[in-house]
Amino acid sequence: MAGTIEVLVPGGEANPGPPLGPELGPTPVDVQAVVQEINDQTAAFDGTEVPVTVKYDDDGSFEIEVGVPPTAELIKDEAGFETGSGEPQEDFVADLSVDQVKQIAEQKHPDLLSYDLTNAAKEVVGTCTSLGVTIEGENPREFKERIDAGEYDDVFAAEAQA
């Protein structure tokens, strides 16, 4: 491959404008074809920021790799809010259920350093702490302590055996 471009684009809504267009302009690839391929591959993420890598050759051929959106984007999408709290320890902007935390952990697990779903869930809970999002109405730090105490082993262990 002659070059690689890494960008963050809204799923299914990439366009030839920034950030993609200026990066692709000087390359030999057909910008519109790249945009169409990215939109086809990211349609399921519907507006959520998705990391995309475009690898291209001098002959104009290209390959696209779509990553998993950042954890914060998945949480925002799942909980339905735009920006996190300015005071995340005091002012909470949304609430997630245990099932929503599990779903996000399952989506992110391949990209995380966690060796199992329980630890992936704890990473998601850590991001909830930074954003000001509660889980089951509880402060995320307290929720993490309950995970550590084994209260949710049955929820997160089922996936490990599957």
UniProtKB/Swiss-Prot annotation:
Alphabetized PROSITE patterns for the sequence: RIBOSOMAL_L11
Protein's job: Forms part of the ribosomal stalk which helps the ribosome interact with GTP-bound translation factors.
HAMAP family assigned: Ribosomal_uL11 (MF_00736)
Protein name: Large ribosomal subunit protein uL11
Alphabetical list of InterPro entries matching this protein: Ribosomal_uL11 (IPR000911), Ribosomal_uL11_C (IPR020783), Ribosomal_uL11_C_sf (IPR036769), Ribosomal_uL11_CS (IPR020785), Ribosomal_uL11_N (IPR020784), Ribosomal_uL11_N_sf (IPR036796)
Region named Disordered: 1-27
NCBIfam families from the UniProt entry: PRK01143.1
GO terms classed as biological process: translation
GO MF annotations in UniProt: large ribosomal subunit rRNA binding; structural constituent of ribosome
Cross-referenced SMART domains: RL11 (SM00649)
Family: Belongs to the universal ribosomal protein uL11 family.
Record has Metal-binding as a keyword: no
Assembly and interaction partners: Part of the 50S ribosomal subunit. Forms part of the ribosomal stalk which helps the ribosome interact with GTP-bound translation factors. Forms a heptameric L10(L12)2(L12)2(L12)2 complex, where L10 forms an elongated spine to which 3 L12 dimers bind in a sequential fashion.
Keywords, comma-separated and alphabetical: Ribonucleoprotein, Ribosomal protein, RNA-binding, rRNA-binding
GO cellular component: large ribosomal subunit
